[in-house]
Amino acid sequence: MKRPIHLYIFVILSSIASILRLFSAFVSTFNEEQLRASMQGAAGINVEELILVSRETANLQTSMIQKIAAIVMFGLLIAVIVFLFMKKNELASYLYIGYLFSTLLLNTYNYLAGKGVAQLYSDAAFRDVTAATMLGGYIINIVLFAIYFGVTVFFHLRKPKEQPSTAINSTDI
């Protein structure tokens, strides 16, 4: 039986992203003093507004929804890895598709919640640039989802299904 090399590669890349997501949800902190010190000499920037937006962004990244999603998605990847090692490639493929849809849901949530945070800017130019940046990131995430999903489904549908062997269990003479 051929190994699903594409799934191994996708799981490795997704594991890196999932570890970064766990780090962002559980370990990252907002340091107001450091941000204030780095923006001290900047001209044309409302430092208090930037700190407010940065604080709300940090709160969004470390919210309970982010933590639960990070744990669930990491658990899905662990399950995919376990089933790949058990040579249950079809089940691993289904679980990975579930992981992909959970990333799509989380990215949609992050985009919609981020739009609310961007509204905290009083300057329309900052709001527009922030909204455009978030939209660009969301589009990139959708494109990556489409690529990963398309390749996974293509190889899943292309391979022959695992059929139980009747030769071993046969009692006919």
Residue ranges and their predicted role:
Residues 1-173:
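Topology signature of small-to-medium multi-pass alpha-helical membrane proteins
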